[in-house]
A protein has these predicted regions:
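N-terminal secretory signal peptides and thylakoid transit peptides that target proteins
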Residues: 1-16
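Solvent-exposed beta-strand/loop surfaces of large extracellular or lumenal domains
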Residues: 105-107, 169-176, 595-616
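Aromatic- and carboxylate-enriched substrate-binding clefts and catalytic-loop regions
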Residues: 350-500
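C-terminal beta-strand-rich structural cap/linker in extracellular carbohydrate-active enzymes
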Residues: 612-634
Length: 634
């Protein structure tokens, strides 16, 4: 629904009285708005004769984004000035109502929004496209341009309501940081936030998160605090150099990538996304990132995410829990993967010491156990079309089905372009990918279904990680909002720190990753008392429900369905607790249940219970500090 001030009162008269949120809104002078299909979310564009264009976002008549700057400057030089004025007019209102197959949180995605274009004039001239969804808003800048190299510079800011609480980490570890929780008044000028930035809105209004989607032919974004409740969108060349990038590539390469990238032809920025929900369930289930990302190319993916050669699955991995870096060692891992019913074995870089005959020997051996093989590769070795073609042709020759590409660690346009080239070239050879040392996801897995997952998270590889329980119960409501993450969950040794075995098993069912790589040695999984339940945890889900008892940094409780089977998975934070959980999500009928509980006397043990349950059952669950619970209902 698109409204101007002149038509607003006329529109109100036609509204049913059962939607009071709509009736309370009054637009300021010289304002245009785009309203979500259900009327609860409004994007307002405010402009005056001699003032810059600003926007604001409201949810149920309460502010989510306070009046904030926006704008796109395009220059042939890299030091643009602020525009003196903008004047806006609205064009082309439209509505979208569609569904599409997806994977991860759910099997069906929905794109329902109202949209409009706004022509912006003044010192800069461009189009602003806005879409309002029932779970947030998205906007982007469009500039037709010509073949002259031009450098884009954005004025976009996100000013949050006072009394908001935010969760974010900086760029020191690129996207492998630990989230801080701060009142917005405590965030200082110059602090950096790596998206997504999660927000708890004041007065129990709900939650929001800020990130981007459909990132291509453009630099990735970060957020820089202004010390006044605002965050300024900052492009990749201006972001601080991360420790991983400096370690792997050096400061001279970082300096080179700090030069703003010029774009030839039309400029289409990524969508700037504000996810909005009344609770954590609504926030986690927000579908905007996928909805605004381009659909997959039917040339490569005739059935989209269901294309035959693109197969999500679970994987064993020799890296964090013993094993041999040898051909025989990898044969053992593949055999054990088959015993677990897992689909893949991810082989680290030592495969490069083998001959092609040895590579094929492993692949053929693994195939005998219905286990596919993935190879690791350094991204610096795949910078040219020739190098990519050589590698993917090797994968085809020896039968490798997927590649784990590592060490990107930068949001510069050059690196974003590399992701796109890798995904396209891999698709041409029908090779699946996952990225490590990577940037946040931004909808790439919708456009390129051969991207199964990416790291961009502080996961089990972080051997010095402390306070893992608090970290793990924060991640589902922060990093995972942007998309799947390869945390490499479930370790039964010292890396689990203060978390229990039950917590570790539950993490595999909560941390979404269509390529679900397990940290534990497969023998240790087979020897665990919970192995029969672990074997049944899928890597993709048909439905995800975040339960009301969830609280960021304290408790993550998910009910998830695959087919007719439900899982209840809970990770507890630092404080021991006892909670009661109703099983109304099960629907009618009795179900056989397997419950894995904390052993309250020993964190490195579990208690297994076999019982029956139905939708009227209420489970009483006691968890230790860093504890957990997981139940399977067949």
């Amino acid at each position: 629904m698109i409204q101007s001030r002149r038509s607003f009162l006329k529109g109100v008269l036609a509204l049913p009285l059962v939607v009071p949120d709509r009736l309370a809104w009054a637009l300021p002078t010289n304002a245009e708005s785009v309203v979500s299909p259900n009327g609860t979310i409004r994007f307002e564009l405010v402009h005056g004769k001699n003032s810059p264009v600003k926007y604001q976002v409201k949810f149920r008549n309460r502010p989510v984004i306070e009046p904030s700057d926006l704008g796109l400057l395009v220059r042939t030089q890299d030091a643009p000035d602020k525009p003196s004025q903008h004047v806006a007019r609205r064009t082309g209102p439209y509505a979208m109502r569609e569904s599409f197959p997806t994977r991860g949180l759910r099997s069906i995605g929905v794109n329902q929004c109202n949209g409009a274009y706004f022509e912006i004039e003044g010192d800069a001239k461009y189009r602003l496209e806005v879409r309002a969804f029932d779970d947030g808003i998205a906007f982007r800048y469009l500039d037709e341009g010509d073949d002259t190299p031009r450098v884009p510079y954005e004025l976009t800011t996100f000013v949050l309501p006072s009394e908001s609480v935010v969760w974010f980490h900086d760029f020191q570890g690129h996207y492998e940081g630990v989230h801080a929780r701060k009142n917005i008044s405590e965030v200082k000028d110059g602090e950096w936030a790596a998206p997504p930035l999660t927000v708890r809105l004041p007065a129990d209004v709900g939650y929001a998160a800020i990130t981007e989607a459909a990132l291509m032919n453009y630099a990735g974004m970060g957020l820089r605090a202004d010390g006044r409740s605002g965050f300024k969108l900052t492009l990749g060349d201006q972001l601080p150099v991360s420790y991983p990038f400096e370690l792997r590539y050096g400061l001279s390469e970082a300096k080179r990538l700090s030069q703003p990238a010029a774009i030839r032809g039309a400029i289409k920025t990524p969508w700037r996304v504000v996810m909005i929900g009344k609770d954590l369930n609504a926030l986690v289930n927000c579908q905007i990132i996928e909805a605004v990302s381009p659909a997959p190319d039917r040339k490569f993916f005739p059935l989209g995410v269901n294309t035959k050669w693109v197969k999500p699955g679970r994987a064993v991995w020799k890296y964090l829990d013993g094993g041999q870096n040898t051909l025989d060692g990898m044969k053992e891992f593949s055999r054990l993967a088959g015993e677990l019913g897992f689909e893949y074995n991810v082989v680290e870089g030592f495969w490069q010491r083998w001959s092609e005959a040895q590579m094929k020997e492993l692949v053929d051996y693994a195939n005998g156990y219905k286990v596919g093989t993935w190879f690791w590769k350094h991204s610096k070795e795949l910078r040219t079309p020739y190098a990519r073609r050589q590698f993917f042709e090797l994968c085809n020759r020896v039968g490798v089905v997927g590649a784990k590409i590592d060490f990107f660690d930068h949001e510069a346009k050059e690196i974003i372009d590399l992701y796109q080239s890798l995904l396209r070239d891999a698709a041409e050879h029908q090779v699946m990918l996952e990225f490590h040392g990577s940037n946040k996801p931004a909808g790439e897995n919708r456009t390129w279904p051969n991207e199964l997952s990416r790291e961009s998270i502080r996961g089990m590889e972080a051997s010095r990680m402390t306070e893992r329980a608090q970290h793990n119960t924060t991640l589902p409501f922060t990093r995972f909002l942007a998309g799947p993450a390869d945390y490499t969950p479930m370790h039964f040794g010292e890396r689990r720190r203060e978390t229990s075995w039950s917590h570790q098993v539950a993490s595999a069912a909560i941390f979404t990753s269509p390529l679900l790589i397990y940290a534990a040695h497969p023998r240790n999984i087979l020897d665990n008392p919970a192995v029969e339940l672990i074997k049944n945890i899928p890597s993709v889900w048909d439905e995800t429900v975040v339960l009301d008892s969830s609280e960021i940094g304290k408790l993550a409780a998910y009910a998830r369905r695959k087919g007719t089977k439900w899982f209840l998975a809970i990770m507890n934070g630092p404080s021991p607790r006892k909670i009661d959980i109703g099983l109304d999500f099960l629907g009618r009928g009795n179900r056989r249940a397997v419950l894995v509980r904390d052993d309250m006397s020993e964190p490195a043990a579990v208690k297994i219970e076999h019982t029956t349950a139905h939708d009227k059952t209420a489970l009483s669950i006691e968890m230790r500090s860093g504890g957990g619970f997981i139940g399977m209902f067949g």
